[in-house]
Amino acid sequence: GGAKAILTLDNGETVYLDENADGRQLQLAGKQIQIDSTTLNYSAANGQVVQSALVYNKVEVPQGGEYTLVLNDGTKVHLNSMSSLRFPLTFEAGKREVELAGEAYFEVNKTGHPFTVSTQGMQI
């Protein structure tokens, strides 16, 4: 399938992540987020102002799609068709947790802090 996904921001706004999103940038909670047709990169936002409350975003991949997401800690998540990932814009100190529905491949950046994936009532 092709690279396509839908990003839902914590305020409910949706952004379609496809070839029309190439080169686009989002301002989220004072952070600059890079978008292209295959990857959404939050790691460039690392080191900028950290907010006090966690802000969650969600990427959903429709049937026939796939998409790669780079979390703010540098972890790469390759989401398959009919899958979604809910994740914080920035992780809390010492703890990295995301919620997965469906199927994904994680390339976890080794930071010395645990990385937890919650899926269907289980934590991995």
Regions found by a protein language model. Name each.
Residues 1-124:
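Short acidic/polar, Gly/Pro-enriched loop/turn segments located at secondary-structure boundaries
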